[in-house]
């Protein structure tokens, strides 16, 4: 009776030990800096990074022609998402990546960095409520990984009230961005 159980694979790995103070503080700081709602989002980013680093370690030991092809493919994927910004990367560059490199490529972070929102939390709210479009298509997932090609195409959605230049909240956002650029220029 009832529907069959839906089996799914977890997209993250939890920490081995739940109560390590340094890890908890580091995760809390990442959640605050990037406007994440749960530590699970940090764990997902760590799992993505772990996957790339594991592949790089395997390719360092693999000296065959196939290993070289796979290394080039890994570099292309990381460059496509803007995680690896170096022109001629090596596998050591992949091993030196951090969780912040992954979190910087989330749509939520890029909306905040582009000045479409005042805070990372507001960026998340705008995305979830359907006010942000990527390449003309509304994206409602704050964890959406933005490619380098799509980065310039992030904007307010066509049907969003934020698309109007006279929207009062948008005026606050633009004013805040102008203040930040002035303080950076004076420094």
From Swiss-Prot:
Keywords: Ribonucleoprotein, Ribosomal protein, RNA-binding, rRNA-binding
Domain S4 RNA-binding per the UniProt entry, residue ranges: 105-174
A Pfam family per the record: Ribosomal_S4
GO biological process, one term: ribosomal small subunit biogenesis
Keyword Ribonucleoprotein: yes
GO cellular component: small ribosomal subunit
GO MF annotation terms: rRNA binding; structural constituent of ribosome
InterPro entries: Ribosomal_uS4, Ribosomal_uS4_arc, Ribosomal_uS4_CS, Ribosomal_uS4_euk/arc, Ribosomal_uS4_N, S4_RNA-bd, S4_RNA-bd_sf
Domain of life of the organism encoding this protein: Archaea
Function summary: One of the primary rRNA binding proteins, it binds directly to 16S rRNA where it nucleates assembly of the body of the 30S subunit. With S5 and S12 plays an important role in translational accuracy.
Quaternary data: Part of the 30S ribosomal subunit. Contacts protein S5. The interaction surface between S4 and S5 is involved in control of translational fidelity.
Annotated family: Belongs to the universal ribosomal protein uS4 family.
Protein name (record): Small ribosomal subunit protein uS4
Source organism per UniProt: Methanocaldococcus jannaschii (strain ATCC 43067 / DSM 2661 / JAL-1 / JCM 10045 / NBRC 100440) (Methanococcus jannaschii)
Gene name as annotated: rps4
């Amino acid at each position: 009776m009832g529907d069959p159980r839906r089996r799914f694979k977890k997209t993250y790995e939890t920490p081995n030990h739940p109560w390590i103070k340094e890890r908890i503080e580091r995760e809390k700081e990442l959640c605050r800096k990037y406007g994440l709602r749960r530590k699970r989002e940090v764990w997902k980013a760590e799992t993505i990074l772990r996957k790339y680093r594991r592949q790089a370690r395997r390719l360092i030991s693999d000296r065959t022609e196939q290993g070289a092809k796979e290394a080039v493919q890994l570099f292309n994927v990381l460059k496509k998402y803007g995680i690896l910004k170096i022109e001629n990367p090596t596998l050591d560059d992949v091993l030196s990546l951090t969780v912040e490199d992954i979190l910087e490529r989330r749509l939520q972070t890029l909306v905040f960095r582009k000045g479409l929102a005042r805070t990372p939390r507001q960026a998340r709210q705008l995305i979830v409520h359907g006010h942000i479009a990527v390449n003309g298509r509304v994206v409602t997932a704050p964890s959406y990984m933005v490619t380098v090609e799509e980065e310039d195409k992030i904007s307010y959605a066509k049907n969003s009230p934020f698309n109007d230049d006279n929207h009062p909240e948008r005026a606050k956002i633009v004013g805040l961005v102008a203040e930040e650029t002035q303080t950076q220029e004076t420094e």
